[in-house]
């Protein structure tokens, strides 16, 4: 069984993707990185292909159309399940999620079924405003209730 898969979705993340991949690989963990790109017109997938020559742990799925974050995450989850990864961690490609927390999540998961990071807990950073803030805040409360999490 493969152990760790890091998943991210991209659309026009050319300026961030190399930084993200380097930060993840600098953790020196045995992991794979799957990136679902929605045919970014800025050259994101071309940059990922270049990075694949440097890092053998990168998996790129380039979709023909922009079909959104939710379907990208579904694809990542299906890939993880099909390829029997033990752990899956999703990060935003825009660097709003700190890859250094991957080690914290992996340490915590040993005692739980699920670990969920949130910008609303102590130490979290929230820069959302207006409707995005409300949707995110209440969406997280609903997820916590469904998962019966603390």
Q: What kind of feature is each model-predicted range?
A:
Residues 37-46, 95:
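A conserved acidic beta->alpha catalytic loop
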Residues 24, 76, 94:
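Residue-level signature of catalytic and energy-coupling elements of molecular machines
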Residues 4, 31, 57-59:
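Short, conserved active-site loop motifs that form the nucleotide-linked donor/cofactor pocket
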Residues 1-23:
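N-proximal low-complexity "stem/linker" segments adjacent to membrane-targeting elements
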Residues 61-82, 87, 99-150:
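Acceptor/aglycone-binding surface of glycosyltransferases and processive sugar-polymer synthases
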Residues 31-40, 61-62, 91:
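Short beta-strand/loop segment that forms part of the nucleotide-sugar
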Residues 15-19, 42-51:
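Acidic helix N-cap motif at the loop->helix transition within catalytic regions
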Residues 22-31:
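Short, acidic, metal-binding catalytic loop of nucleotide-sugar glycosyltransferases
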């Amino acid at each position: 069984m493969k152990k760790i898969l890091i998943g991210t979705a991209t659309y026009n993340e050319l300026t961030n993707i190399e930084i993200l991949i380097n930060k993840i690989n600098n953790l020196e963990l045995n992991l794979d990185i799957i990136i679902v790109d929605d045919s970014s017109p800025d050259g994101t997938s071309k940059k990922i292909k270049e990075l694949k020559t440097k890092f053998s742990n990168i998996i790129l799925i380039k979709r023909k159309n922009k079909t959104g974050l939710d379907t990208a995450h579904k694809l990542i989850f299906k890939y993880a399940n099909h390829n029997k990864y033990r752990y899956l961690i999703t990060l935003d490609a825009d660097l709003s999620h700190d890859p250094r927390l991957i080690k914290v999540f992996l340490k915590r998961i040993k005692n739980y079924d699920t670990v969920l990071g949130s910008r609303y807990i102590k130490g979290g950073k929230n820069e959302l405003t207006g409707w995005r803030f409300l949707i995110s805040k209440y969406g997280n409360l609903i997820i916590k209730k469904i998962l019966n999490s603390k």
